[in-house]
Structures are given as structure tokens and as C-alpha cells.
Amino acid sequence: MKELMNVSTIGFDVAVIGAGPAGISCAASLADIGLEVVILDEQANPGGQIYKNIEKVSDACLKILGEDYKAGKPLVQRFRNSKLTYFSGACVWQVNTDGHIFYSKEGNSHEIAARYIVVATGAMERPVPFPGWTLPGVMGAGGANNLIKNGGVKPSGRVVLAGSGPLLLLEAVHLIEMDVEIGAILETTPAVPNLSSLVNLPKALKRIDLLKKGIVMLHKIRKAGIKHYKGIRNLTAKGNDRVESVHAMKADIPLDIDTDLLLVHFGVIPNTAIFRQLECRHQWNDVQRYWFPQCDKWGRTSLDNVFAAGDGCFVHGAVSAALKGE
């Protein structure tokens, strides 16, 4: 694999944007059949958000992050062994429909061109504004998880987690294993599942492995004696120069919890910035509540030379993203 620092306009068969599981799987597969492939990513190393720093993570952090994170190692190793061009630390800021891509690296702007473009920019945490969300000390649970991956960095002081989704519980488990004090978990998920969610129960039962992972996480949280509230509303972060406490309502009961850090997570959505810049056709998913680019079964968007791979076109998770990249 060639890793270039500076380059003028160069032509490639395919340019892949994003070096997460979908991007590196796609790039490696294309390189295997002899195509000239370039892949660009803003991070210093391949792996995306889900497998961030997988090549350099310590054994102690690897134990905390678990087998799902460890599964990224063979993907990255295959990518490293592929004959392709890799631009790390490259921030793509413009993509044209004619295949020209503009990006910045180390303070300089560059341009490359490709016959086909694969956008594999993955997912992002869903931004949900609430009173006090811009206070210092309020951050995404995914961001906190990345700090663990990057260097085993753990929060100091007391932490409250709020929002919904499995990543919220996963982050809580990671913090428990790092001996971080957790003041409470405030879930917006209803305490009693509504009828619309019960419709999906038969499908859920087909993935007993995932249900088991969820049960194990809940058991660890319960065993640690952490207060876990469900069905909360009116989430508010309070403080002067930084967050000092969290307020929420549980039914008609007010909750006020002192904290040094509030980690929030409300699920993930496709990162569609490049698709929107290219004016690819999008559609709305009424269940997941997000826009995503329309694609055929091969990932081709409404533009003949632009393809989508991974969670950037619909969120299915890292394993599925790698397969879609293939």
C-alpha cells in the first residue's frame, strides 16, 4: 500500500471516501481485482469510528472494548496488505459529479480525479438539542468512547449518561469496567415497550446473540448498583461555566443529579454530507427517522458514477458495513 503525503491531480479508477469498515473492505476488494484505487480519510489510521486506533490500542483497553471491537483487526490488516493508494489525514471538502475530489492535508489543498466514487463516510451521532446542551462538560457518548480507544482516557469525577440506544449502555459498561463513578443512566426509551415496538419482536428473536449482549450489559449495570431510569423526559443540563447538574422528569417525579460530565446519545444516523453536496436523491425512513441516499442493490446512487457503501447509506452496523463494502 502506498501512503502519500503530497500529490497533485492524479487519475484513479475508483476513489473511496472514508476508511471505516465499509471503505477499507471496498478498497481492498477493488484492489484485489487490479483496479487503481485511492482511499481518503480524515483520521490518521484506518478503522473509522468503530475500529478507531485498532492497530495501536493497548491490551488493557482491548479487554474493555471487547470482541466486537477486536473484530476490526483482520479487516485493517487486509487493507494494509492491499496494493492501493491511501491518503490519511485527508479532509475532503468538495466532491464534483465529474469525479474530481478536493481535500486538505497538513494545511495544503489537493485535487484528485477518479472514474467512480464510493462514499463510505459511515454514521454519526444523532444531534438532539436540549436546554444546556452546549455547556462545557456535555458531550456525545460516542466521543467519550473514542477517547477510550485513542489512549485509554477515562473521565474524572462523576458521570451521568442520558438518551437512548445500545451505545449508551455499552459506554456505561465500559465506564464501569474503568471504575468511573456513574451518577445515573437516564433513558428516554419507555419503561414499558409500546405496541409498535412489539411488532418487531419476532425479528428480534432471530438474533438471540444480540439480545444476549443486551441482557449482559443490563446485568452489569444492575450489578454495579447504578440508578437506571427509563421513560425520562425534559432533559436539561444545568450549570454556570460548565455542567454541574442534570434535571429530568420521570413521569411526574423530578430528578436532579449532580454531575461533572453528561454523556448523551440518541442513536446514529447516516452521514449524508457528501451525498447532499452531490445532490444525490434521498429518501426518508419513517421508522429510523432519518434521510438516506437512494441506492440500488449494488449501492449505485442516483448518479451513475457515485456509489454508497456502509452506514452512510443506511445504518446496519459495522459487520454489515464491511459486507456492503465488499
What is the meaning of each model-derived region?
Residues 2-326:
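Residues forming the flavin
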